[in-house]
Amino acid sequence: MIEAPEGLIIVDTGESVDQSRKVLAEFRKISDKPIKAIVYTHFHPDHINGVKAFVSEEQVKSGEVRIYAQETLLDNVVTQGSLVGPILTMRSGYSFGVALSDEDKRDMNAGLGPLAHEGASTFIAPTDTFRDSLDTTIAGLKVQFLHVPSEAPDEIVLYLPDNRVLISAEVTQGPTLPNVHTLRGTKFRDPVVWVASLDKLRAFQADVMVPLHGQPVSGREKVEEVLRMTRDAIAYIHDQTVRWMNKGLTPDELVEKVKLPPHLAGYTPYLREYYGTVKHSVRQIYQGYLGWFQGDPVDLDPIPPAEKARRLIALMGGRDKVLMAAGDAYLKGDWQWAAELSGYAIRVDHDDKLARDIKARSFRRLGYASMNINWRNWYLMSAMELEGKLEGDVALEMSRRVRAAFLSPDMLKNLPARIFLQNWVTRIDPEKSGDVELALGFAFPDIDEAWTLEVRRGVAQLKSGIDPAVPLRLTLDKRYLDTVISGENSLLKGALLGDVKVDGNLLDIKTFLGCFDFEDAPIALTVR
């Protein structure tokens, strides 16, 4: 909360309405001034989902409250969980330890701050956006906005020149080594760009820095020190990874070679590996520059994992000997080796209870020993999967809960029809559509948009507009489409009840819709 002369500015709105109402109650103990502006520093759910705890859509529509963000934020919000939504939500559940027991969460935090709490997610689109920078006055206070891509591509910071205060968003991630790569999966986070953004923050020479995770930093020299050490750590990881890449080292070799020097590794707490790690940052840097192929042609067309495991087990004397060795490694505290050995047996037989038990126990040991919260969560969630506690409806329910945070009903209102239909392209099932050549038009009169989705023998293409020669057409309001996306309704239900107007042969439309795979099946990440 920034208390300006004429009102309040709220920078980021928390992970849910429930939690943010508690925050607002605390703010109201300090000031009863009206809220004049909201700032979204970037599109991640824990920074935007609680907005309606602070303001209403009516206040924003009337102009009473302005919402500031970088110009790409809205696109990022509506696309973050769409194209790769099913796998991203499952992986996010593992990263955040969503299904862990209270016992496994006890005394834990999120690595960069307190654990997030589930609750109602809301969203209101920005009213004021900019590309690179914006100098303005909000509620009588001078504010300088600056776009600084780093932890997110749309990251922005605020500088209050009259107070010499820098609100650094997640360019600094609080008391932890920054997460140059996130295990849940994101597009390449460029360390060079991140370092440049940190240098832009240093140029402010702020007296106080307020990160969106972690404690404020006071004193110009201390602010400079934290920013400099953070940029040097990221630069060191990047530069030394590239240096050794250029000598031919591969990811498995790089992670043993690239380590922070003592003056950086020991800079507590800001560079401790609570959230990011050097090892998984190194791997993504290699991948970002060179891709998956490491140079050994044996990887071009490898033996399938299950067959490879079968051959290795035979070479090692059979399943029993392999699992005896895995059990022996576990008892000796060599948990990584125990997990790897038992994994071969699981590759051959997913229902091998002894192998799953050894691997689960090994992962629990590795998780409890890990200082990094992301690694810990992945180990323990994977152990749950191996123990049979994260299957079927349980896995689907967890995925649904995560999806609700990434794509709430308010966000769906802002999801363009184009994005929704474009997702169909990657849902086409070649077995069902191999002999089909049909096109279906989608008309949305309330937003004056029309699109055509064409199926051509296993390939789908989305086109703008509807050619008069296309005989099949669905006409519906975008408002109704929003309820289809949320799962409240369906196109078939709309056709039966009159919310969707159907033109063309119903059997052809049924054939067309049958070309796509919309089944949400549980995804196993560890038992493979």
UniProtKB/Swiss-Prot annotation:
Disulfide bonds: none annotated. InterPro entries: Alkyl/aryl-sulf_dimr_sf, Alkyl_sulf_C, Alkyl_sulf_dimr, Bact_Alkyl/Aryl-Sulfatase, Bds1/SdsA1_MBL-fold, Metallo-B-lactamas, RibonucZ/Hydroxyglut_hydro, SCP2_sterol-bd_dom_sf. Gene3D superfamilies: Alkyl sulfatase, dimerisation domain, Metallo-beta-lactamase domain, SCP2 sterol-binding domain. It catalyses: a primary linear alkyl sulfate ester + H2O = a primary alcohol + sulfate + H(+). GO terms for molecular function: linear primary-alkylsulfatase activity; metal ion binding; protein dimerization activity. SUPFAM superfamilies: Metallo-hydrolase/oxidoreductase (SSF56281), SCP-like (SSF55718). Zn(2+) 1 binds at H42, H44, E151, E170. It is an enzyme of class 3 (hydrolase). Binds 2 Zn(2+) ions per subunit. Induction: Transcriptionally regulated by SdsB. Its cofactor is Zn(2+). Alkylsulfatase that cleaves the widely used detergent sodium dodecyl sulfate (SDS), which allows the bacterium to use SDS as a sole carbon or sulfur source. PANTHER family: ALKYL/ARYL-SULFATASE (PTHR43223), ALKYL_ARYL-SULFATASE BDS1 (PTHR43223:SF1). This is Linear primary-alkylsulfatase. It comes from Pseudomonas sp. (strain ATCC 19151). The gene is sdsA.
